[in-house]
Design a protein with these regions (language model features):
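N-terminal leader/targeting segments
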Residues: 1-3, 18-19
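Positively charged n-region of N-terminal signal peptides that target proteins for export
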Residues: 2-11
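Sec-dependent signal peptide hydrophobic core
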Residues: 12-17
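C-terminal motif of bacterial Sec signal peptides marking the signal peptidase cleavage site
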Residues: 21-24
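OB-fold nucleic-acid-binding modules
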Residues: 26-91, 95-364
């Protein structure tokens, strides 16, 4: 395939990007998890189509130095797909990795698992795409015209089809086991890994046993207004005596959030100069917009904390964490994508098959 610049193609892409690109979304959103009709047979790309010359994913990530960078000149990466959005815990993105590193590709559509199979080789022409960062995680996307984020999604099919090329099918990537000492090493960020024998809960440097629920007084308001709009929950507020009311699920669907909210367990959480209870209407309902909420459940690996973040739109959002894990009588091992958020270890499950007992058998 000739990768020389096609002037008309680039002009068309520029026009489309100005008209169609949306900014990156900070939160998880609904994900189509059904099945599309089988597409027509497509061309399968091979190394020969690209002259057999590739930039490693590690070298691509090194292009980022404290600011987003638009890739210029010939730059093609090649990697295997390591994620699936079938259960809804990833949003408009997939991860690929080669022998050097892994990276998130921000493809702006749902149902990616129907098009990009686990283990399939993917080629990405990075020319004119942008390498950016989100709270410590380097990703590849399009330039965000609003400058609110460092990258946005490849929203239009024409743009996707001229940058992302499907290669041959292969066996799924095998996860690498990562130790506590390697949790925050750059080489492991964005890769499919397994971490073993974690205990539920994590006491931070302030002595708080962490659980993190991200919710908003106004879901349509400023989601970066942490003082007046965001609801953060840890055990600095009193845990209810009735343990059944505590947040013991991987995330919260909209229905589950309402169940928790109307139980009253969040009433004393401080927000916007008051408490959640202050946002009740005269009839006793809460004046808080309804949406699904992501939850980070904290676990301890050795002496390190790992937050396992799950989407309220995931099929397993309302699935309870095993009782033996919650009460500390059993440990848990995870397989999924290792990331970080503001310097702390964060983990994304692909599905509940990635949640194992100490002996390697499934919890679910």
């Amino acid at each position: 395939m000739d990768l020389n610049t096609d002037i008309m193609k680039r002009i068309f892409i520029t026009i489309l990007s100005a008209a169609a690109l949306l900014t990156a979304c900070e939160e998880f959103q609904p994900v189509f998890t059904g099945k599309y009709e089988n597409p027509e047979e497509q061309y399968i790309y091979t190394d020969e189509d690209f002259g057999g010359k590739f930039t490693s994913i590690a070298d691509l990530k090194k292009m980022y130095v404290n600011a987003p960078v638009k890739v210029k000149g010939r730059c093609v990466i090649k990697g295997q797909v390591t994620t699936s959005d079938q259960v809804g815990n990833l949003y408009k993105s997939l991860y690929i990795q080669d022998e050097t590193a892994g990276i998130e590709i921000k493809i702006g559509k749902n149902g990616l698992y129907n098009e990009y199979k686990l283990g399939q080789w993917i080629y990405v022409d990075c020319t004119d795409l942008t390498v950016g960062d989100y709270n410590g995680m380097i990703n590849l996307g399009y330039e965000d015209p609003t400058k609110e984020y460092e990258t946005s999604y490849l929203e239009h099919a024409y743009i996707i089809d001229n940058h992302v090329f499907k290669g041959e099918y292969d066996e799924p990537v095998q996860p690498v086991e990562v130790s506590e000492a390697d949790l925050l090493k750059d080489v492991n960020m964005g890769r499919l890994v397994t971490i073993k024998n974690l205990k539920y809960g994590y006491v931070d440097s302030y002595g708080l046993n962490q659980i993190f629920i991200l919710a908003y007084i106004d879901p349509n308001g400023d989601r970066k207004d942490y003082t007046n709009n965001c609801i953060f929950v840890d055990d600095s507020w009193s845990q209810p005596a009735d343990r059944s009311l505590w947040v013991d699920t991987w995330a919260c669907s909209e229905a589950k959030w309402k169940e928790y909210l109307y139980s009253g367990i969040f009433d004393n959480v401080e927000v916007a100069g008051g408490t959640v209870a202050d946002f009740k209407n005269p009839d006793g309902t809460y004046n808080i917009g309804s949406m699904a909420y992501s939850v980070s459940q904290y676990f301890t690996m050795g002496k390190s904390g790992v937050q396992v973040r799950s989407s309220g739109y995931a099929r397993f959002a309302d699935t309870k964490i095993p009782a033996e894990v919650l009460d500390g009588t059993a440990t848990v091992s995870f397989t999924g994508i290792l990331t970080k958020y503001k310097g702390e270890s964060q983990f994304t499950l692909i599905d509940l098959d990635g949640v194992k007992k100490a002996d390697g058998t499934n919890w679910y």
